[in-house]
Design a protein with these regions (language model features):
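Short, glycine/charged-enriched secondary-structure capping and boundary segments
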Residues: 52-56, 79, 105-108, 128-131
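Active-site segments that bind and position negatively charged phosphate/pyrophosphate groups
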Residues: 191-255
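Short glycine/serine/threonine-rich phosphate/pyrophosphate-binding segments
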Residues: 22, 46-49, 97-104, 123-126, ...
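A glycine/threonine-rich phosphate-anchoring loop and its flanking beta-alpha core
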Residues: 108-201
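Structural motif
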Residues: 37-38, 88-91, 112-114, 150-152, ...
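ATP/NTP phosphate-donor binding region
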Residues: 1-88
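Fold-independent oxyanion-binding glycine-rich loops
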Residues: 19, 42-43, 93-95, 116-119, ...
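A short, small-residue-rich loop immediately preceding and capping a beta-strand
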Residues: 83-105, 109-118
Length: 255
């Protein structure tokens, strides 16, 4: 029997993708815990999410951090110092680079991580990894964390209102996962079953995107929140991340 040990981390512990998803924060955290939250966000991201933010964002004691840097060691150290002591949860609001930084900060502080994606350009909200950069903004490597993200809160209307170029980027990135997986695992029958499940998921997601993208893009142009649009967004964020989670190094390159 061939031995190809892999680690499977399928996805976050909780994933909510529907209007009003932010309300689920209170299903898992008390007001006292949320008053000790660290919210980290980008300038455009927090503006995009502003009308959807839950009351927990304004609780006394909450730490708000506007971040403009990279997921670098120096930036994460600075954020950890700025966060202070006795924090309960890290909540990241933004795109892939911001969420990678917030994920790294949460692990540095030993806290659960909640992702609030404001664009659908990558599966960063789903995946338990961060891409690290140096201070000049050059990518160095990625780190897979020992635990899954605790929660993803996806508010579809925020994604609907984002520039369409981000959705197009996510569609292209996610379509590529099927083709990359075929190259990385040319003999899937010799690999663990979960790798094959990941490849099957990549194919299913590819089909969703090929069938629904045209309608989803038109719906976004018309500012209509439809099933086709939500399917494409979930295919990018949840589906794309799940492919890497199931197949590890055999499907991870696109995650």
């Amino acid at each position: 029997m061939p031995h190809n040990p892999i680690r499977v981390v399928v996805g976050p512990a909780n994933y909510f993708s529907h209007p009003g998803s932010f309300n689920h924060l209170h299903d898992f955290f008390t007001d006292e815990q949320l008053s000790r939250a660290v919210w980290i966000y980008g300038e455009r991201a927090i503006a995009a999410a502003q009308t959807k933010l839950p009351p927990a964002f304004e609780l006394p004691g909450v730490k708000h951090i506007l971040f403009r840097g990279h997921c670098s060691e120096s930036d994460v150290q600075q954020l950890a110092a700025e966060s202070g002591d006795d924090r309960s949860v890290v909540i990241g609001v933004g795109g892939g680079a911001l969420l990678d930084t917030a994920k790294a900060l949460a692990r540095r502080l030993g806290l659960p991580f909640v992702a609030v994606p404001t664009i659908a350009a990558t599966c960063a909200a789903w995946t338990p990894l961060s891409v690290w950069y140096n201070d000049a903004g050059q990518a160095l490597h990625y780190e897979i964390f020992d635990d899954a993200n605790f929660m993803v809160l996806l508010e579809p209307e925020i994604i609907l209102n984002a520039p369409q170029e981000y959705l197009l980027a996510g569609i292209g990135d996610t379509l590529a996962k099927w083709y990359e997986a075929v190259v990385l695992a040319p003999q899937p029958e010799t690999l663990p079953l979960t790798v094959r499940l990941g490849i099957n998921n990549a194919q299913a997601i590819r089909d969703v995107l090929l069938n629904s993208t045209e309608q989803a893009l038109a719906d976004q142009q018309n500012q209509q929140l439809t099933q086709s649009f939500c399917d494409v967004v979930d295919a990018i964020i949840a589906g794309g991340g799940m492919v890497g989670g199931l197949g590890d190094r055999f499907t991870r390159v696109a995650a």
